[in-house]
């Protein structure tokens, strides 16, 4: 409520007199009652002074542990092999643990072999054992080394947290090996006996795998995915499967993620776009094999409709694995779904004039007799004029065959169990932005005016800007899946398409999506997409501070972590903007961008010592990583070093624990004052 409104409300309250006054005493009594009920509930969990006191001691000890390591990845674009490898090596975090433990006591080659074993234990072990003359000795040496690294990785966690991370099969033995036993006079003999037994009973292989996976898990405490799991790469579904098993994760949706969410919700514009992008990059296997979506009706329609059409405007990008016949088939499907997409989008634009996208409807601006497009007062020669399914009098209407295909695809997307599970995960773990440990995470941009103020955007008749715009769009994405009211659900579905390509969308942030122009017009100036002013203000501290405050952060010491835009390192561009206040960490996993950027992108580590930015060389392959031990070469640099090591007490979780300690201290006071009686326990 604005200050003026508050004053007016106060004046109105005075005019009403005593009769209209709120019963503040009743409110206070209700608050007291609520607090009493809360303490009663807390007393059920901690029924004695001893139990409450012990929990306070435990929580206080956690507050003083080193902060867990956060790992930030973005713009994975379906490149599952590179993603999986970076996840395994923690952007160099595993190697740092190995260096911490062994220093100069192991050769560089031995350290690299140990790191590769931790990343790919089963595969690497099978290769080593093929040539190893004394496997039992190798098992023992390797187990001792892995135990040492695992102890280091576990050192910042409570015993309780480590216990929860242990694989059930080896939980007891691992706990013994990882825990320092001060009560034993001959610890070496004790540990050696355990290791000898593991080897003697034939469980060394399984134990090495379990230890390696535990090191991976303990090295990174929490994973942030700052958008775009989906796009042009071949395995977004594999990445989603991997993410769903990760121990602690959040996702900030990217534009491609929301596109697939819209497709899963049955939004036809999103469905057509998702299929078109798969076709464009030769990844229709994602749909057919990954999600079991039947594309045969589309393929049959494409052959029948474009049988003699070479479809030269719809050639594949970035895929050399197709035969000539497969490539021809793919191009015809690519054209068929593209024309369907332009029609579907035309229907959405007509349905929602408030989206302000009328200028993106271009089919009715084609002069079919002359083969030209009239746009922005100019005429452009069309590169392709074979449109047998487009009626010049009603260009956005589906033919009966197209309508049937889209109805089938809509059912297929909405009834695909695996796709729906993936989208439920994105809804549960994801959002348009995240504020976490004094960092603001989002994909794309905060829509701004030319003067750096927040741009006001109309969404279904109401205006929003800044954080409020993010919140309402996030809300409509969820409505698109769960709203009971059919009208609201339909609005939510269409809003996902809006988020995908509207200039006012935080996830797009360009004046247009020039898909049509890129296919059909040779003039490069028509392909240009002008970015939101946000992208020109990444070095403007005043603007960045305004954004941080808008999302509830004090600018001093806070950071914005931003995905979406590839950083052109080869041209000298830095991912650090405004003295490190904003970090652009497009992961660069997509091979298509690597020629443009010069590297394979950036990832970020935030541990108890500060922020570490890792710049990666391209990933060759999983096979090369195992056989040649060719880890992704990464150059790491400290972006922000903290003079005092950060503890759990300095984090968001720490603040929650401090609140819990306060509540427990109130419970203790209630016990000591006699307001609540201790429970009798035998």
Question: Where do the language-model regions lie?
Answer:
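Feature recognizes metal-dependent phosphohydrolase scaffolds
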Residues: 2-7, 11-21, 25-682
């Amino acid at each position: 409520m604005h200050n003026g409104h508050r004053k007016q409300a106060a004046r109105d309250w005075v005019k009403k007199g005593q009769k209209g006054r709120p019963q503040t005493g009743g409110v206070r009594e209700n608050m007291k009652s609520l607090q009493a009920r809360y303490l009663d509930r807390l007393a059920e969990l901690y029924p004695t002074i001893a139990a409450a006191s012990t929990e306070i001691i435990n929580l206080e000890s956690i507050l003083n542990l080193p902060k867990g390591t956060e790992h930030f990845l973005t713009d994975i674009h379906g490149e599952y092999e590179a993603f999986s490898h970076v996840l395994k090596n923690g952007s160099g975090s595993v190697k740092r643990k190995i260096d911490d433990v062994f220093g100069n006591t192991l050769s560089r080659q031995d350290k690299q072999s140990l790191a590769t074993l931790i990343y790919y234990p089963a595969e690497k072990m099978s290769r080593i054992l093929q040539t190893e003359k004394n496997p039992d000795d190798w098992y023992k040496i390797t187990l001792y080394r892995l135990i040492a690294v695992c102890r280091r990785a576990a050192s910042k966690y409570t015993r309780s947290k480590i216990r929860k991370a242990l694989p059930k099969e080896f939980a007891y033995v691992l706990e013994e090996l990882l825990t320092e036993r001060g009560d034993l006079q001959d610890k070496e003999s004790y540990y050696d006996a355990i290791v000898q037994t593991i080897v003697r009973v034939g469980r060394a292989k399984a134990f090495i795998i379990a230890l390696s996976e535990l090191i991976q898990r303990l090295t990174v405490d929490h994973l942030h995915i700052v958008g775009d799991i989906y796009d042009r790469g071949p395995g977004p579904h594999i990445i989603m499967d991997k993410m769903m098993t990760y121990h602690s994760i959040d996702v900030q949706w990217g534009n491609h993620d929301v596109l697939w969410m819209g497709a899963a919700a049955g939004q036809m514009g999103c469905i057509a776009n998702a299929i078109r992008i798969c076709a464009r990059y030769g990844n229709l296997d994602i749909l057919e094999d990954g999600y079991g979506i039947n594309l045969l009706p589309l393929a049959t329609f494409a052959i029948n409709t474009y049988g003699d059409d070479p479809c030269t405007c719809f050639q594949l990008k970035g895929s050399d694995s197709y035969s000539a016949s497969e490539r021809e088939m793919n191009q015809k499907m690519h054209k068929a779904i593209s024309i369907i997409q332009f029609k579907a989008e035309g229907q959405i634009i007509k349905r929602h004039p408030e989206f302000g996208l009328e200028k993106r409807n271009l089919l009715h601006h084609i002069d079919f007799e002359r083969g030209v497009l009239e746009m922005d007062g100019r005429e452009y020669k069309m590169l392709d004029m074979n449109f047998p399914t487009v009626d010049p009098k009603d260009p956005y209407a589906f033919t009966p065959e197209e309508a049937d295909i889209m109805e089938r695809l809509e059912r297929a997307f909405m009834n695909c169990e695996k796709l729906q599970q993936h989208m439920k995960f994105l809804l549960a773990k994801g959002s348009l932005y995240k504020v976490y440990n004094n960092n603001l995470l989002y994909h794309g941009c905060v829509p701004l005016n030319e003067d750096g103020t927040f741009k006001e955007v109309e969404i279904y008749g109401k205006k929003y800007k800044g954080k409020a715009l993010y919140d309402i769009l996030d809300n409509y994405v969820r409505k698109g899946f769960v709203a009971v009211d059919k009208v609201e659900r339909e609005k939510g579905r269409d809003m996902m398409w809006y988020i995908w390509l509207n200039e006012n969308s935080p996830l797009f942030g360009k004046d247009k999506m020039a898909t049509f122009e890129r296919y059909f017009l040779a003039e490069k100036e028509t392909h240009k997409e002008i970015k939101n002013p946000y992208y020109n203000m990444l070095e403007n501290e005043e603007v960045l501070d305004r954004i941080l405050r808008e999302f509830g952060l004090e600018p001093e010491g806070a950071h914005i972590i931003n995905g979406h835009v590839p950083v052109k390192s080869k041209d000298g561009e830095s991912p650090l903007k405004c003295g490190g206040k904003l970090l652009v960490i497009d992961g660069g996993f997509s091979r298509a961008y690597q020629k443009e950027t010069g590297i394979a992108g950036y990832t970020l580590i935030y541990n108890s010592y500060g922020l570490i930015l890792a710049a990666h060389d391209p990933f060759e392959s999983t096979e090369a990583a195992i056989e040649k031990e060719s880890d992704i070469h990464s150059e790491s640099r400290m972006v922000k070093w903290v003079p005092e090591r950060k503890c759990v007490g300095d984090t968001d979780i720490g603040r929650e624990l401090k609140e819990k300690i306060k509540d427990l201290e109130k419970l203790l006071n209630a016990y000591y004052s006699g307001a609540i009686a201790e429970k009798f326990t035998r």
